[in-house]
Design a protein with these regions (language model features):
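Active-site rim helix/loop that mediates acceptor-substrate recognition in acyltransferases
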Residues: 30-49
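Conserved catalytic-core motifs of GNAT/GCN5-like acyltransferases
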Residues: 114, 130-142
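Acyl-donor binding region in acyl/amide transferases
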Residues: 73-126
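Residue-level detector of flexible, active-site-proximal loop/helix-junction positions
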Residues: 10, 87, 142
């Protein structure tokens, strides 16, 4: 397995490959209701977000990831905004190591991500991530 950080100029050429992974991640957690796929593409192409792919030993993309850098008064955070793919157990550590290296290069103090509890227990807890809060969402019905 290999992980690659994509240059913003690479995005149009790989979009058809990474789109299904990102679309699935957006829809799984209903994020697409407030952040449509077209906006993900816009942010990747503009450089506001960073795109990553994980490629298996056969050269097949098995995951697509989107990160963002959030600037806070006391330090920057690399946020894993979207992650879609299969068999995270095969590449999760690879992703973690790459994001840690990227955070160090960017001078970020933290890495944050959201996750289902099951993935958190199996993956993030083991790597030393701390659960800081749980996120809840309520959809207001405008009539």
């Amino acid at each position: 397995m290999q992980i690659y950080k994509l240059n913003k100029e690479d995005i149009p050429g790989v979009w058809l490959t990474i789109r299904p992974f990102l679309d699935s991640a957006l829809n799984k957690y209903e994020v697409s209701k407030k952040f449509p796929l077209e906006c993900v593409l816009r942010d990747l192409v503009s450089g506001a977000s960073q795109g990553w792919v994980i490629v298996n030993d056969s050269g097949v993309v098995v995951s697509a990831i989107v990160t963002e850098i959030e600037h806070y008064p006391l330090g920057d955070t690399v946020i894993i905004f979207l992650m879609g793919g299969e068999s995270m157990g095969d590449w999760g550590d690879l992703l973690h190591n790459a994001i840690v290296k990227y955070a160090e290069e960017m001078g970020a103090k933290w890495i944050e991500t959201g996750s289902r509890r099951g993935i958190g227990k199996l993956f993030y807890d083991r790597l030393g991530y701390k659960r800081r809060y749980e996120s809840y969402s309520y959809e207001v019905k405008c009539e």
